[in-house]
Amino acid sequence: MRIVNLIILLFLFFQTSYGKSVENSPAYGYHLKVGVPEARRILLKESWRSARIVGGSQVSAANVIPYQVGIIATLTGGASSICGGSLISRTRVLTAAHCWFDGQTRATQFTIVLGSLTIFTGGTRLTTSDVTMHPSWNYLLNDIAFVRISAVTLSTTIQLIALPTTAETSQKFEGVNALISGFGKTSDAQMTFPTSTALHQATVPVISNAVCQNSFKITIDSSHICTAGTGGRGTCDGDSGGPLTVVHNNRRILIGVVSFGPGEGCQASAPSVFTRVTSFLPWINSNL
């Protein structure tokens, strides 16, 4: 409770200091602006097939991205919102802090979905309210959180994603092709058109923070990592908290957590921004 109160006090400090910039930030009010409408849209159209990640393709089987986690957030008041996550141990999921509290709306429970290509049906489902946001989270920085779950049984469709090693913390991964995945939208136009909850993926190149900064008015910090939006590929509404992974030293590792995208829209060919996992390894390892 003390940590939650501290986070709220820190948020109020930033809100007072930066005024309207807080309300205009990508994470502020995520659930009411993005998560709740997206959850309703998915529930209404779940039987249809369409793309999710912008510019991507549908994942063919649950064992293709077995570390992918779907998160259904139950909010104060009872509405549902959606996010993504990554399974990093049998009892831990890594996601974005704003999936639990976005500065405006707080979740009261997560339904964790594992081993499924759809978020509202299928797979292994666990409920939990045991979530730890980074203690220094604010509307722009440290957008990362731990979700504690009952120990899951690993299988061909439920697997862990490896974390970078200490020796890999200096790696920036610039120019490397990375994999993004999620249950979110694939276009800015997707509102009530036929769609589905099918998991989708796309390959995108990691770019330097300097190049990324050119597309944003807010500061891109060293604790962020960005991917190019060339060809309209990138993350979209509902993908928050999901994984950014690369193959490095012959193993796939988690290097980013979906945080925010361009204000111009998902198809603006602008970069997607992630929380850089290597910047938080000490905190992550202390919570495993």
Language-model regions, residue ranges each:
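Conserved H-D interstitial segment of serine endopeptidase catalytic domains
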Residues: 71-74, 93-96, 100-139, 146, ...
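Protease-domain processing segments flanking chymotrypsin-fold serine proteases, especially trypsin-like
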Residues: 2-94, 110-114, 197
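Extracellular collagen-like Gly-X-Y triple-helix signature, i.e., selective recognition
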Residues: 197, 208, 247-288
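Chymotrypsin/trypsin-fold serine protease catalytic domain
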Residues: 126, 144-151, 156-231, 277-278
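Active-site-proximal beta-strands of protease catalytic cores
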Residues: 90-97, 175-186, 245-264
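Extracellular/periplasmic catalytic domains that process cell-envelope and extracellular macromolecules
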Residues: 59-64, 87, 104-106, 120, ...
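Catalytic nucleophile loop of clan PA
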Residues: 80, 86-87, 171-173, 233-258
